[in-house]
Amino acid sequence: TEAEKKMVEKVKTAFPHVAVVLNVGGMLDTSWFKEDEKISAVLLAWQGGIEGGLAAADILCGDVNPSGKLTDTFAGTLEDYPSSESFHESLDYVNYEEDVYVGYRYFESFPQAKEKVIYPFGYGLSYTTFEISVKDLKVEKDKVSVKAEVTNLGKRAGKEVVQVYYSAPQGKLGKPALELGAFEKSRLLAPGESQTM
């Protein structure tokens, strides 16, 4: 809201580093903070419930290393989402005009939409860095198996989420260009430690 933006502007004048915590339940316009050099960090807390404030504080103070990933795509403005035109027409029915291209599938399938992405589906930061390398890939009839090794290259312990995406052949009906096929989170990896998943 405009009131929240004004509050952030006041905070920015008082502090050299500003972290914005978003306690939201859906998409929002991200254009106002993406390119703002005075906003050092943005933490998406979603709706953490009664312990959400403590969890956010643990992350912001560095007591916990974040390992979450976005469950949706964040575009620059609300108008960048194809559902924004029809979403609030009815209180009890949503017409998904984008068909099978709901959410990240839309942004991955259409080049003009991909350009509007600020934070992609599956995006997330950590206080450490990881390397993910594919160790084995098997295709057996209708099943694909992937083994990946995650290595903590940083100086802090942390967890990483391995995400496997696929592209299905196009048929008579349109299909998204890319879909999430599987994901798995590693255990807590010490610096230099690896895990095969």
Locate the predicted segments by residue.
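Generic low-polarity alpha-helical segments
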Residues: 2, 11, 97, 103, ...
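Secreted, periplasmic, or luminal enzymes acting at the cell surface/secretory milieu
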Residues: 23-159, 165, 191
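Active/binding-pocket-proximal capping segment
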Residues: 35-38, 163-172, 178-181
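Hydrophobic helix-and-loop "lid/oligomerization" segment in the mid-to-C-terminal part
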Residues: 1-37
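Intrinsically disordered, low-complexity Pro/Gly/Ser/Thr-rich segments with frequent PxxP/GP/PP motifs
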Residues: 172-197
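Low-complexity, flexible helical/coil segments
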Residues: 9-19, 54-59, 77-82, 183-186
